[in-house]
Amino acid sequence: AEAGVSSVLGQGGGVEEVLAMFFVNELCRIVQGMHEAGLIHGDLKIDNCMIRADDVDEWTSTYAADGSGGWAAKGVTLIDFGRAIDMCCYPPDQRFLADWQPGAQDCVEMREMRPWTYQADYYGLASIAHCLLFGKYMDTTCYVNDDGLKTYKIQQSLRRYWQTDLWTRF
């Protein structure tokens, strides 16, 4: 059975933090595997994530990252590879520029018309995590330090009872 990840979001809020961690962990593993194979999805967003919740005879209540105990039947499947890029077809130092009008869902490099590669997927992962936690799309604010270095931060505050160290580093 599959459903869109966005369908599990509550009204006005996200999902429980532990469920968000599970989905984000699964997505990180998928994206890491894709990147190791030289693939960029290019359009990671919550609408392109499907929940994988197949029935299993025995399913342990303790998560097993290796998929044992029925966990291989639970997780996330990515869809919509319309913007995918096979980096094996390009020189190792190849970078890209957006040839469309980038929107808020696109990475900062695209919006600022700067070269990008895997940043598109990392921004997408952060955006999905944000949507799972807060129940809405990510808005960022740009800060420029005295040296001209830009940093971007989400506009929402993390809840004090969340694993803030984990999410801040993410």
Regions found by a protein language model. Name each.
Residues 1-18:
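Conserved structural core of kinase catalytic domains
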Residues 47-108:
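Activation segment/activation loop of eukaryotic-type protein kinase catalytic domains
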Residues 7-11, 94, 140-147:
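Short, flexible/disordered intra-domain loops and linkers
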Residues 112-116, 123, 127, 133-170:
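Helical subdomain adjoining the active site within ATP-dependent kinase catalytic cores
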Residues 23-24:
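Activation segment signature within eukaryotic-like protein kinase domains
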Residues 44:
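Hydrophobic HxD+1 residue recognition
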Residues 35-36, 61-65, 126-127:
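Eukaryotic intrinsically disordered and solvent-exposed regulatory patches
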Residues 29-39:
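Protein kinase catalytic-loop region centered on the HRD/HxD motif
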